A protein has these predicted regions:
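C-terminal regulatory/interaction module of P-loop NTP-utilizing enzymes
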Residues: 1-167
Length: 167
């Protein structure tokens, strides 16, 4: 059995400590309101995920929780892989997907230089889907890539310039 808790940092701090006895050698989940204790089966795995780049000082895992898990770090997929993912998921040509990934690469370079976070593959798929539905590429990139990641007018202009250069 596998339990997957996505975006664990979004959970209230007082709720994440509930998994402590489940995630250590006790392998138990106490349910206080019912007076029950559930014991994990031998092949039980608890998997949590979160995006460290989206955290603030207020949204981080407690050290006592972090230390109960192995950590694996993922970066964006390689451009050729990401292009194939975008093309497949959005139903656009590989050429359109490659252009969107090129935009993402350029915009991701602005992270920590005015942008808090880069362009996710999800946003590329949203933009590609709009393009497939007939929305002009510049407009699709504006509403699905640029505006979701920044409100800063100068940064928006910069991203739109990147879009114009590639599309």
């Amino acid at each position: 059995a596998i339990v997957y808790l996505d975006e664990i940092v979004e959970a209230r701090k007082d709720t994440t400590v509930i998994i402590h006895p489940l995630s250590d050698d006790r392998r138990l989940l106490p349910i206080e309101k019912k007076g029950q204790v559930i014991e994990a089966v031998d092949d039980f795995m608890l998997v949590i995920s979160y995006n460290p780049g989206y955290q603030s000082i207020l949204k981080d895992l407690k050290q006592s929780t972090k230390q109960r898990f192995m950590a694996i770090e993922f970066d964006y997929p390689l451009p050729d892989v990401e292009s194939r993912v975008v093309a497949h998921e959005a139903g656009v040509s590989l050429e359109v997907a490659q252009r969107l990934v090129k935009i993402a690469e350029k915009v991701r370079n602005l992270k920590n230089h005015g942008l808090e976070e880069g362009v996710s593959t999800r946003l590329l798929i949203y933009a590609a889907t709009l393009i497939r539905q007939g929305v002009p590429a510049d407009q699709a990139c504006d509403v699905a890539i640029a505006r979701p990641i920044t409100d800063d007018p100068d940064m928006l202009r910069s991203i739109i310039e990147v879009v114009k250069a590639i599309f």
